[in-house]
Regions:
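Short beta->alpha connector loops
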Residues: 9, 34, 53-56
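Rossmann-fold NAD(P) dinucleotide-binding segment
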Residues: 40-48, 52-73
């Protein structure tokens, strides 16, 4: 599965490690320093995005992902 990570703190890194161990591909990593990457072809190619930020940022992140037809959990 192609996965985009939204939030790359301690939990984001842990999710990346587990996903890779299980044979998934990380196609995009979005963090506060590269919000513009929501518009990248790599992000749009994801089968799913895993959002692990904070409640304040989460809603906007969901909207950005949905704008590219990427499902979010």
């Amino acid at each position: 599965m192609k996965i985009a990570l939204i939030g790359y703190g301690k939990m984001g890194r842990m999710i990346e490690q587990i996903a890779l161990e299980r044979g998934h591909e990380i196609v995009s990593i979005i963090d506060v320093d590269n919000i513009e990457d929501f518009d990248s072809p790599a992000f749009a190619s994801a089968d799913v995005a895993i959002e692990f930020t904070n409640p304040t940022a989460a809603f906007a992140n969901y909207q950005r992902a949905f704008a590219h037809n990427v499902k979010v959990v």
